[in-house]
Swiss-Prot record:
Tissue: Expressed in Rdl-expressing neurons of the mushroom body, the neurons projecting to the LC9 optic glomerulus and in a neuronal cluster near the subesophageal ganglion (at protein level).
Placement of Kelch repeats on the sequence: 263-312, 314-369, 370-417, 421-467, 478-524, 530-581
Protein name according to UniProt: Leucine-zipper-like transcriptional regulator 1 homolog
Subunit organization: Component of some BCR (BTB-CUL3-RBX1) E3 ubiquitin-protein ligase complex.
BTB domain sequence ranges: 574-670, 801-870
Length: 975
């Protein structure tokens, strides 16, 4: 947590969860009970300075925050914005520099950085044992704080619980200031001095305040990393809970489930013989089933009704009632019942005026104290109308005037509410059933169909297949879809939709998960950070009464595509220029990204490089070429930029392809314009030329999605003219459809087509069976951004490396553009302090990581890989801060690795890494594990490579454990 440092006296508030203003203002510490909390603006940053800055750093920044003097800490005037200044003095207090300054310092003045009088505090944590922390509690100084006290007091928390990373960072972020003209600058998306620390990363809500996970006896607080080794449910873990006994509640389907506080309430449904109207309850804390107390008249037995929670009440609307055993009195309802949780009472609402028609299998949601009813089945037809009821006003229904791209009439679909919108996915729609996701924005009352085409959004997996009787819930920034009937199958995979990136993915469950069987007409609800599923129908119409729990995770989002896309748009550090089309339009890019994604363009770049080499040798002579090339590679302008000509390419199409190269997305504007169809045809041709099959596949998907009656003839004409058979066939297939043919033929553009095309359309219409769509391209949809960058890092990018990263005796070739796109540390270095020999010494704070750990970091930077052994995690959890990554996603996975992956097989590596990084709590845990499994650990080859000191510590730990064992034996013997 960000501990308080205020006034001229350094107060060491090290009590866990203790009080104190948050560093950077705006926050008070949590209670002293051990439950951590951070409140205030949500984001804060500190500008630290000292007048006694080493010459190397002062020459870089040319600025010191605060006035010289006592070296105390001084609150900024604008404290309500969450800013804090720490004024420097003659005493070397904590010094906070921007990534560029630190990069320069590490490269230019290593001796000064290592001096005890010039301790830089850029993103450093002091990893001391809990005993040492207790010894420092009483430490305070008057007038100045030395670097040791700074480290003890100011702990920059990058901690983010994997299940609770929802802080939005409400306040503005401060930045350490530099005067005009300083070489160290920060712009929107640049590096430089803007350093914001997420003070709400452990918050339980987006307000920037809340309570984090309480420190338990089995958990360890490693300053910037809180690791919990107590037993708990792993993320993405399916767990089978206690089944509901028959005497409590029958096995059922077509029921509803709602969550209220720490319980799940189940109402209605049918057991295969009778409809039900009982109300049963499952408590998630005591993990037990029981009947809920209820007074008043409950709703009649029913199924396919809806249930929502508003305030402290549950509302039941509509559904299908009657006697299914005798097949009598079967009817749909439009009644509304309220169940008040606090008084356990049923109340029926009465209405005057217009009401929704009776219905079942509809959707219901609550937003803005209103209940919203959508679609369903009225006994004769499916519906798509919408009604709303103010739950705090008069008992009056209002029909909603829906705008936008409305879904087709449907029933047996789920709804979920998130971000001022209601989401509807698939459902029964007869011939119109699709796997489309629709969004209804409550404030504008407008529908929007969300594109399912994965390549358009950069998705790595397809959306769920069309289905009905499934469930969908919202948690964090995701929608989760489970079960249902999908074309006569009952899948049990869990699909996830990311509301930020707008892509679908399939959740891979944790090993040893008890995954529920596929089912239909079940029900689900979210309680805290888990989804609970109850009941449903499985094979052969068998009703179930089982309950399953799925543990969510809330990792910070992967910013790989966003980082690369922004880097392309900013046009920083471009090292190649494409001259495109007859007009010779010049488009800047980066060699590394282009070479990674296209073999054709990679060969063009190598050929252009060879031609440039020969030209330079002609002009300057062989002896001068190497020096000029080095200057050009280092970012200087003394060497010519590489040029590649693409005379036959469309500049607009090529720019879109470049954006795809960086982001894996096809980003088109004005998507309903006729020119878009021509443009996508040009992109398809270039994708084939550049050997990018996934992009070509995306173009076909896009055409299927966007072709309509107004532009299909234009697309057909261009495909025929360009001899692109697959696009031509897709256009033909669209034209000859019964619902499209008449409108297309009667359009004015139809008569303008060439005679051979007209004849072909008529013949295809008369003999549609002869139209065969080539689907061979679907077997090879190419590689994703991650796969290409992985191959580029490991093999194909060796010829394009332009920077050397030195880690002790190891030289690791890399690519400046990739490093700069992801790390503000490297961005600032390459902009202002580029090493003349293209060599960068690697450290993370004061620690040199292991070679394996740094390779794990490179894999994360290049293609977002988060798998790592725990010993690598110990080195890397400071990396997001030190290197200026976009968020603390890597940090969260370091935490995950430490909590899940320490075993007797890697415990010695973990012990060694924790000793080097001085994370003594992890070291203590590793020693305990070694003692526990000493017979296995002692036979590992790694033990022979440990230092003498670590071997002695292991021997002492084993001896101590034997001493405790003998003591227990003596006590038992005496008794």
């Amino acid at each position: 947590m960000l501990k308080s440092i205020s006034g001229g006296v350094g107060v060491a508030s090290t009590e866990r969860g203790g009080g104190g203003g948050g560093c950077g203002g705006g926050g008070a510490g949590g209670s002293a009970s051990g439950s951590r909390s951070t409140s205030g603006s949500g984001r804060a940053s500190c500008g630290l300075g000292s007048s006694s800055i080493s010459s190397g750093l002062s020459a870089v920044c040319g600025f010191v925050t605060g006035a010289s003097g006592g070296g105390g800490f001084e609150r900024d005037r604008d404290r309500d914005r969450g800013l804090a200044n720490i004024s420097g003095g003659s005493t070397p207090a904590g010094i906070l520099y921007c990534p560029a300054c630190m990069a320069a310092a590490n490269q230019q003045s290593p001796s000064q950085n290592s001096s005890p009088h010039h301790e830089s505090f850029f993103l450093r944590s002091s990893f001391k044992s809990s005993k040492r922390n207790k010894a420092r509690k009483s430490a305070s100084t008057a007038g100045c704080l030395d670097a040791q006290h700074i480290r003890a007091n100011l702990r920059m928390s990058m901690s983010s619980s994997m299940r609770s990373s929802r802080g939005n960072g409400g306040g503005g972020a401060a930045s350490s200031s530099h005067p005009p003209g300083s070489s160290c600058s920060s712009g929107p998306g640049g590096s430089g001095c803007s350093m914001a620390y997420d003070a709400a990363s452990n918050a339980s809500s987006g307000s920037g305040s809340g309570s984090g996970k309480a420190t338990s006896p089995g958990s360890y607080s490693c300053n910037a990393l809180n690791v919990d080794f107590t037993s708990y449910t792993a993320t993405h873990q399916w767990t089978r809970m206690l089944e509901c006994a028959e005497f409590v509640g029958a096995k059922r389907s077509k029921h509803t489930v709602v969550a209220y506080k720490d319980a799940m309430f189940v109402f209605g449904g049918d057991n295969g013989k009778n409809m039900l109207n009982d109300l049963i309850r499952f408590g998630v804390k005591d993990k037990s089933w029981g009947r809920a107390c209820a007074t008043g008249t409950p709703p009649a037995p029913r199924y396919h009704h809806s249930a929502v929670v508003a305030g402290s009440s549950m509302f039941i609307f509509g559904g299908y009632t009657g006697d299914i055993h005798s097949n009598s009195n079967l009817t749909n309802k439009n009644d509304l019942f309220e169940y008040k949780f606090q008084s356990a009472m049923w109340v029926e609402w009465k209405f005057s005026g217009r009401q929704p028609v009776p219905r079942s299998a509809h959707g219901a949601a609550v937003y803005d104290n209103k209940m919203w009813i959508y679609a369903g089945y009225d006994g004769n037809a499916r519906l798509n109308d919408m009604w709303t009821l103010n739950l705090t006003g008069e008992n009056q229904w209002e029909e909603v005037d829906q705008l936008g791209d409305r879904p087709p009439t449907c029933c047996n679909f789920p709804v979920a509410v998130a971000r001022d919108a209601m989401y509807v996915f698939s459902g029964q729609s007869g011939l119109q059933i699709t796997n489309s996701l629709f969004e209804f924005h409550f404030k504008t009352r407008t529908w929007r169909r969300i594109s399912n085409e994965p390549v358009l959004r950069g998705a790595t997996s397809a959306p769920p297949s069309r289905r009905y009787g499934h469930t969908m819930v919202h948690h964090d920034r995701f929608l989760y879809v489970f079960g249902g009937s999908a074309d006569s199958t009952l899948p049990n995979d869990l699909h996830c939709y990311d509301l930020d990136s707008q892509v679908w993915s399939v959740i891979q469950p944790e090993q040893n998960s008890d995954v529920p069987s596929g089912r239909v007409f079940h029900a689900s609800a979210v309680i805290c950070d888990a989804m609970y599923i109850f009941g449903g129908t499985v094979d052969n119409s068998v009703r179930r009464g089982d309950t399953y729990r799925f543990q969510f995770s809330s990792y910070p989002k992967c910013t790989l595509r966003d980082d690369f896309g922004k880097f392309f748009q900013d046009k920083q550090f471009c090292d190649i220029q494409f001259i495109v089309g007859a007009e010779e339009i010049r488009i800047l890019a980066h060699i590394a990204f282009v070479a990674a994604r296209s073999k054709y363009l990679r060969n063009k770049i190598l050929a252009a490089r060879e031609a440039r080499q020969q030209q330079m040798e002609k002009v300057y002579g062989v002896g001068q070429v190497d020096a000029l090339a080095l200057n050009a590679g280092a970012g200087g302008d003394r060497g010519p930029m590489l040029e590649v000509r693409l005379a036959n390419a469309s500049p607009e199409a090529f720019e879109i392809i470049l954006n795809y190269i960086y982001t894996d997305r096809i980003d088109l504007k004005d998507t309903y314009s006729k020119n878009i169809i021509i443009l996508i045809t040009d992109i398809y041709q270039l994708a084939g030329l550049f050997t990018m099959p996934r992009l070509a596949h995306g173009c076909i998907q896009y055409l299927d999605y966007k072709i309509n009656k107004l532009n299909v003839l234009e697309a057909l004409y261009n495909a025929d003219k360009s001899n692109i058979k697959i696009i031509k066939d897709h256009c033909m297939q669209f034209i000859i459809k019964e619902e499209n043919f008449t409108d297309v033929v009667m359009s004015s553009e139809f008569s303008d087509l060439d005679k051979p095309l007209l004849v072909e359309i008529i013949r295809k219409r008369l003999y549609p069976s002869k139209l065969v769509i080539d689907t061979s391209y679907e077997g090879n949809i190419g590689t994703t951004l991650e796969i290409d960058l992985c191959a580029f890092l490991e093999s194909t990018g060796k010829d394009f490396c332009d920077i050397s990263l030195v880690l002790e005796d190891h030289v690791i070739p890399a690519h400046k553009s990739v490093l700069s796109s992801r790390c503000t540390y490297f961005q600032g270095m390459f902009r202002s302090f580029m090493p003349p020999d293209n060599t960068v010494n690697i450290q993370i704070g004061e620690i040199s990581p292991s070679l394996e750990a740094f390779h794990s970091l490179l894999r994360y930077i290049y293609y977002g890989e988060t798998k790592m052994p725990p010993q690598d995690a110990l080195y890397l959890f400071q990396a997001p801060c030190f290197y200026g990554l976009a968020n603390n996603r890597l940090h969260a996975f370091c935490k995950y690795s430490l909590e899940h992956n320490i075993t007797f097989e890697n415990v010695l590596q973990t012990l060694e890494a924790s000793d080097i990084t001085k994370i003594y709590d992890i070291k203590e845990y590793a020693l305990k594990l070694i003692v526990k499994d000493f017979a296995k650990v002692a036979r590992l080859p790694k033990i022979a490579g440990l230092s003498r000191e670590l071997l002695l510590e292991i021997i002492r730990a084993v001896a101590d454990s034997h001493g405790e064992f003998l003591t227990r034996i003596n006590i038992n013997t005496d008794i």
